[in-house]
Amino acid sequence: MGIPMANRRAPIPMKVLMIDIGGSNVKLMVSGDTEMRKIPSGRELTARKMVSEVKAATADWDFDVISLGFPGLVKDGRLVREPLNLSGGWLRFDFQRAFARPVRIINDAALHALANYEKGRMLFVGFGTSVGAALVADSVIIPVELGLIPFSRRNTFMSRLTKEARRQNGHKRWQRDVFAAVLLLQDIFWPDDTVIGGGNAKVLDPLPARCRRASNLDGIKGAVRLWEGADRLAKPHGTTWRINMHPSRSKPTPPPHALAQVA
């Protein structure tokens, strides 16, 4: 005899910890909660130190798996080179062993693009300690490393559009440069939708034309979408991520204890 419908229980969803590594802070959230915690980042932050501080900051949180947004190039879910704005020791670090949880890694701009994507072509640009971007074209996320690309004859995107550039050049000039950069990127990529995020998105007023502002809380949505059972599922393919907009709902979510086993 089958179990009566009234007594059947839906699969228990996995709890996903988001670790979003920025140049100034590492943002932490867990799925199902709106609380965000932060730990300091910067040029002294090693992978080992990050893990230690994340463990301390999340000691009272329950989670089964981890999504890690990394400020640099990621290929097939693995780090390709050391980050520009952090200390070293990241490339060969075993995050799964250190956390004793399954870990999936994604470029940080791609994480937020995944969170905000709806359809068609979408451009995400993040302005903060650094400058990051990702284009989503027909459900394929393509990170764009903008930082060292020339912005003018003597400047790069990094030297004109970061938090430090705003401090040195003043808000008005910085905002003018941001508008010019966004217009340039829109002319190059022809997005249907442009999303502005990063730590400095909140001080852009008004926004550039044809843009919307991302919320700081959006990242957890992208973190969840790296794991089976989400409303959308993104899987790495080289240096891109392919989004399944309609993942099968019939496949049950694996129990957390099974996913937490690390080979």
Label the model's feature ranges.
Residues G120-L123, T129-F151:
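Anionic-ligand binding region
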Residues I149-L183, R212-G222, W227-G238, A263:
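Helical "lid/coupling" subdomains associated with nucleotide-phosphate turnover
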Residues R249-A263:
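Long, low-complexity, intrinsically disordered segments
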Residues N25, V182-N216:
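Glycine-rich phosphate-binding loops at beta-strand->alpha-helix junctions
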